[in-house]
From Swiss-Prot:
GO molecular function: DNA binding; zinc ion binding
Domain of life of the native organism: Bacteria
SUPFAM superfamilies in UniProt: Recombination protein RecR
Renumbered zinc finger spans (C4-type): 57-72
Keywords on record: DNA damage, DNA recombination, DNA repair, Metal-binding, Zinc, Zinc-finger
Protein name: Recombination protein RecR
Function: May play a role in DNA repair. It seems to be involved in an RecBC-independent recombinational process of DNA repair. It may act with RecF and RecO.
Domain Toprim: 80-175
Source species: Bacillus cereus (strain ATCC 14579 / DSM 31 / CCUG 7414 / JCM 2152 / NBRC 15305 / NCIMB 9373 / NCTC 2599 / NRRL B-3711)
Gene: recR
Listed Gene3D superfamilies: 3.30.60.80, 3.40.1360.10, 6.10.250.240, RecR Domain 1
GO biological process: double-strand break repair; recombinational repair
Family label: Belongs to the RecR family.
Length: 198
């Protein structure tokens, strides 16, 4: 179907988002066209502001509007325990359970040779520097229970073995192949509680 150029560009823009195919992109484009102009401008402004005002924490790699982030800045947090997760959305999922009191390190990805992603392409070098510079007693590996997440956890645990830092892996109350962000608070809580040393 041929659309006027502004609609085609809008459809193409929506298709760049994960999980949005051509049909959904067309629906979203026409939905936006039916919105009030003030709502469209507010939506566009929210997108621009989020992109402009948010960055990654220089300490942990979590998404933040200040550096360091609110978690790294919290003096009540146990700085000796670092929970390693793949994405910022995993931090948000962990924080929902309101039980974990340590700090985080966000890898912003996982090792995936099939996609050409190696250890140097994610925040593993920053993790090693952080563990060298800070007094950390335990690293909790909370990567996703899929092939990439398991490979990443195994790689990090092998790297940390000589350091003497206790390395644990969250328990698998999470489904294999699942993502942390989709787990409910109870499942995450049980997985954290049942972590094991690796």
């Amino acid at each position: 179907m041929h659309y006027p150029e502004p609609i085609s560009k809008l459809i193409d823009s929506f298709m760049k988002l994960p999980g949005i195919g051509p049909k959904t992109a067309v629906r979203l484009a026409f939905f936006v066209l039916d919105m009030k102009e003030d709502d469209v401008l507010g939506f566009a402004k929210a997108l621009v502001n989020a992109k402009r005002d948010l960055a990654y924490c220089s300490v942990c790699g979590h998404i933040t509007d200040r550096d360091p982030c609110y978690i790294c800045n919290d003096s009540h947090r146990d700085q000796s325990v670092v929970c390693v997760v793949q994405e910022p959305k995993d931090v948000i999922a962990m924080e929902k359970m309101k039980e974990y009191q340590g700090v985080y390190h966000v890898l912003r990805g996982a090792i995936s040779p099939m996609e050409g992603i190696g250890p140097e392409d994610i925040n593993i070098p920053q993790l090693l520097k952080r563990l060298h510079d800070e007094t950390v007693q335990e690293v909790i590996l909370a990567t996703n229970p899929n092939i990439e997440g398991e490979a990443t956890a195994m790689y990090i645990s092998r790297l940390l073995k000589p350091t003497g830092i206790k390395v644990t892996r969250i328990a698998h109350g999470l489904p294999v192949g699942g993502d942390l962000e989709y787990a409910d608070e109870v499942t995450l809580s049980k997985a954290l509680e049942g972590r094991r040393e690796v």
